[in-house]
Amino acid sequence: MAGHSQFKNIMHRKGRQDAMRSKIFSKLAREITVAAKQGAPDPAMNPRLRLAVQNAKAQSMPKDNIERAIKKASGNDVEHYDEVRYEGYGPGGVAVIVEALTDNRNRTASNVRAAFTKSGGALGETGSVSFMFHRIGEIIYKPAAGTADSIMDAAIEAGAEDVQSEETGHSITCAFENLGEVSKMLEAKLGEAESIKTVWKATTLAPVDEEKALSILRLISTLEEDDDVQNVYANFDVSDEILAKLSA
């Protein structure tokens, strides 16, 4: 099992859902505000904002919160956020990419570096691990959206590149630059997605044992709890046996 989506599910089952939900809304709002500030405040005229709003809706973010985040971009006192990417190695030599939106680069860099160091890893230079990943668009649908065959048909028609259907849902991937168009066509066929975003997909995987898997989980958790961190990606691969033990 590659990546860390299953680990996030494990963590959520162990509690803190409300706190995590609030933090997710805060990060979604920040992305909406930044997108609105960089372009037009109308999602129809701003591809990045349209995706941000679609993703917020998919996460059940209240409409008022979305509108407030858009309006905030036109205010005189709106914070200036920089988009920053950090790269490094976590436990077991696992490559990790961290994306952040921050109004204080020094604070965020210090927090991210501390998280890597505490886990036994090390923060590297930009480009030190991203060559092991490929930037793509990812659209997630819940299982009820359709059968594996119907999802595949819709994805092919929309111009997607790959589909993975499992018990937990359907993952549709496409070229990074086509995410807006593909997600729009899929919405017309399947309804609103559960998640729409660009992701770093690992092209090289690092197998890990149970001990290293737990260490990576702690690192990812620490990073994702930082208000400035938007996304975390890692190239670890864990066996189904270990995953089952962690899920117990």
Curated annotation (Swiss-Prot):
It is found in: Cytoplasm. The keyword DNA-binding applies. Keywords: Cytoplasm, DNA-binding, Transcription, Transcription regulation. The keyword Transcription regulation applies. SUPFAM superfamilies: YebC-like. One of its GO terms (molecular function) is DNA binding. Its main location: cytoplasm. Coiled coil: none annotated. It comes from the Bacteria. Belongs to the TACO1 family. This is Probable transcriptional regulatory protein BQ11790. It comes from Bartonella quintana (strain Toulouse).
